[in-house]
Amino acid sequence: MSARRIATSHGRLMVEDTGGSGTPLLLIHGNSSSREVFRRQVEGGLAHGCRLITFDLPGHGESEDAAEPLGTYTLGGLADAATQVLDILGLDKVVVLGWSLGGHVAIEMLSRIRGIRGLVIIGAPPVRRGGMAEGFLSSPHLRSAGRRHLSRPEVEAFGQAVFGKPVEPFLSRAIVRSDGRCRERLFQAARTGEGVDQRLAVERSSVPIAVINGAADPLINLDYIDTVTFPKLWNGRCHRLDAGHAPFWHAATEFNLLVSRFMADVMEGAA
């Protein structure tokens, strides 16, 4: 596993790459977390047969904060940062996996990269512009997701909501480290309808999409996701694992198996 910082127009971003000749899979983390959340994928069975690329979004983990937060800290800005990472790595064909915020970034990338072979979205309901109330459950923790400054109790409560109990120490550190301007700007942009209509984007996409959520996710409206028409929904259904908002961590074995099967189907043209 090699790690290096890559210079992009959104700042220097920390990228880790397992290398090899396997199918490239870009993993994008969520709001106020870091690439470390995918530890059980990088160290688990998913790394066999795939080239895994994880990175810290601008304003997160070991990446730099954005010099121009108004432009970078939007779904479009973060999607552009991810696209630049792929360009610099020389990857023109890739499967993209995104969790929570990362899932929304991945959907935003659909119109930017012709070489996206498949999409895996976790905890990321594709909502219309101004449609957050449809896709998300009413939760006090969503307010924390959009606040610049968080108290220690808010950090703990937010961590429990997005990752479950116990809150892993690395996640608490990631929340504290993250640039609060990113949280604030993302929600400002969502309220004003910036970015693509995500429901329309997936409903018009010919890219195979795997939808994997936790059956006990406290933040998203699973029933809403079932109303979305994905033209190439993998296995013809949305998968629900025995977990909360982070099934890739709490149900890692089953999750990794599903993603491995999806990757194989994509490469064989069977997805």
Predicted stretch roles:
Residues 9-65:
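Conserved HGGG/HGGXW glycine-rich cap/lid loop of the alpha/beta-hydrolase fold
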Residues 130-131, 148-203:
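Conserved alpha/beta-hydrolase catalytic His-Asp/Glu region
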Residues 9, 53-97, 257:
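Active-site loop/oxyanion-hole signature of alpha/beta-hydrolase fold enzymes
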Residues 45, 206-243, 249, 254, ...:
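Conserved loop-alpha-helix segment in the C-terminal half of the alpha/beta-hydrolase fold
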Residues 98-102, 106:
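Gly/Ala-rich beta-loop-alpha elbow adjacent to hydrolase catalytic centers
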Residues 37-39, 63-70, 130-133, 222-223:
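Conserved catalytic-core motifs of eukaryotic protein kinase domains, centered on the activation segment
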